[in-house]
Amino acid sequence: MTQVTVKELAKVVDTPVERLLQQMREAGLPHTAAEQVVTDNEKQALLTHLKSGHKAKVEEPRKITLQRKTTSTLRVAGSKSISVEVRKKKVFVQRSPEEIEAERKREMDERRAVENAARQKAEEEAKRRAEEDARNQPAAGQPASAPAQPVAAAEPVREAPAPAAAAPAPASAAPSADARKRDEQRRPDKPRADDRNARGGDGERKNAPHRASVKEKAPAPRVAPRTTDEESDSFRRGGRGKSRLKKRNAHGFQSPTGPVIRDVAIGETITVGELSAQMSVKAAEVIKFMFKMGTPVTINQVLDQETAQLIAEELGHKVTLVSDNALEDSLAESLKFEGESFSRAPVVTVMGHVDHGKTSLLDYIRRAKVAAGEAGGITQHIGAYHVETERGMVTFLDTPGHAAFTAMRARGAKATDIVILVVAADDGVMPQTIEAVQHAVAAGVPLVVAVNKIDKPGADLDRIRSELSVHGVTSEEWGGDTPFVSVSAKMGTGVDELLEAVLLQAEVLELKATPSAPGRGVVVESRLDKGRGPVATVLVQDGTLRQGDMVLVGSNFGRIRAMLDENGKPVKEAGPSIPVEILGLDGTPDAGDEMSVLADEKKAREVALFRQGKFREVKLARAHAGKLENIFENMGQEEKKTLNIVLKSDVRGSLEALQGALGGLGNDEVQVRVVGGGVGGITESDANLALASNAVLFGFNVRADAGARKIVEQEGLDMRYYNVIYDIIEDVKKALTGMLGSDVRENILGIAEVRDVFRSPKFGAIAGCMVLEGTVYRNRPIRVLREDIVIFEGELESLRRFKDDAAEVRAGMECGIGVKSYNDVKVGDKIEVFEKVQVARSL
């Protein structure tokens, strides 16, 4: 008999020693150390213990599924056989004794509860019948009540005394029993009360036919009026059944007896579908009504307030006009703030014609090289800077002077307190100078005229004063109220006097602001930065703007994540008259949008969504109105050639300026259509849009990403980059000129006068002519003029000089001319030789 230690046994069975010792202790063995010896009997005992424990853990299967499959062959006509396979499946579930006992108890409890309910119901039914018989007995009379007593006396004695009220009126039991039988046949799921009745139910069932025969022989007044199955069923169920019966018999919908007048709320704009929904009529009814009025509409068409009011009133509804600006009014009320006001720095806008030195003047004031960084040396964005001078702080807005930036200059005049009008002394008043004066007058902003480049020879200040006085700008030297300052942005001459004049105007205006109020301002510029998202340059006009504020900017909103000054340095807050860049908006706002700080995000989101919806509705209504107005004008005309453009820019202001400038190009035959535009780089979606609309991709100070470049290369799209606005406009003009085609012009080459007429057997009438002007060429189109009136137009067929064919004959020489298919040449006629030349057209 081999003996091993606990340690060796653990190694053999591949288990830890500690676990083996624990199992041996559970098996009742006395081993406690790894060196103790284990006999064969102890091994057997340990094995038996482990097997029993394993069997206890493994549960017997509680569900057995038996499947049986039989196959048979079915013969059909045509000696064909079909195999039919029948599958049967049975599932046997083994339940534990506890579950069986619990199920048995539950069934007994349910049976007992059903019997108690049936007994109680039978007692109530008997009591009710007794009460009904008692009520009907006086009306029935004595003759009818006599035969009932023997039947009641002959009723067998039950084992237990039944309720006293069950004895009278046994004749009425049969009808109720018959009614119950009919009810049970009609509703088989309802348990029968007779089967679950108390003791004596069998005797009652045996006597039921006899009682029925007695009832048939009884006089009619003895029996209560018969009820329908539903009524008897409702009586057995009690009062609750009566209410359910009434509910079941009641109609679900009652038709209105007259027209329903509804209150219809109509805003500034409403679609046909929304109007019909408010009136609870089909949209087809509204469309039919509009057709009768002579206006074809669709279900999604936007109606104005007056039209919608007319439709609703004609259809008989009550109209309530709603102001769509209620939300805006509540916003304006919430933004009111009262606090202590302090003086603020003036906001000065520098305006003038292109290349008159606006940015160079600001460059000298700021002591920074800004003009050198602009593409082409011209300003194409609004630049906002604040400068600390010896006399105080001044905020400058530098606007572009190019003709395309009209809207941008108008925004600059709107957001400013004082306008510096820069006029070059050597160039004088130019178109954009006059436009800047008009913007300043329209905004009610005082002007300070800076006559720049006075260091150049040929500067004439009196000429500039005279030209500006024509447009209502009169200098103080001439008795007006506009200060004129002579400056030189290159040398710095007169800059201090200019700043002094600006600050003097600011003192007269008494500019005030409340720094403790929530921030409020205007968007100067906006762009889409690839790394930082939408970035907006904001000029704070009142209050203090802080990092973390919830701002509403036009139809965009967001929480300020960061603020940067004009030098790109982060700042925590910005007071009045300070320009800053803010990050955190959900989109790029339009330049000129007002910015407000709100208390909560919910209000900001609500107003932003309202403004977006309102802008969309107004845009759709305007577009549809334009289509209806132009439908008759364009009828019968040839379709214009269109140059489609997808335009992407670095900032919102430049995008608007380019869209306006390009949209103004064209004539009656060609036009420019900007099918897509946005702020940011050229993306893959822009390239797909250009491909779908057959458009040209223009990038202004932006570039295309890898996906867009791949599509452009694969599809052969035309994509161009620009950084100067002149180049875009010139290229688009050239493209439109190429689309115009060419004009056909006629150049008169020579004129010959007929001096004599000869006859030729080959050519017919030959005109002997003297060439008066130019040169006469063979095989060129000609006109025959008689008394300066064209009588024939054809081709010069034969040209000879001294009986020899000639290719051309110059002025002062004689020649013979044969006109093809024309023989009515007379002396004194003139023959005009010309050519048709195609000439390129221009806009």
Swiss-Prot record:
Region (G2): 377-381
Region listing for G1, in residue ranges: 352-359
PROSITE patterns assigned: G_TR_2, IF2
Basic and acidic residues: compositionally biased ranges: 96-135, 178-219, 227-236
Subcellular location: Cytoplasm
Known function: One of the essential components for the initiation of protein synthesis. Protects formylmethionyl-tRNA from spontaneous hydrolysis and promotes its binding to the 30S ribosomal subunits. Also involved in the hydrolysis of GTP during the formation of the 70S ribosomal complex.
Protein name per Swiss-Prot or TrEMBL: Translation initiation factor IF-2
Name of the coding gene: infB
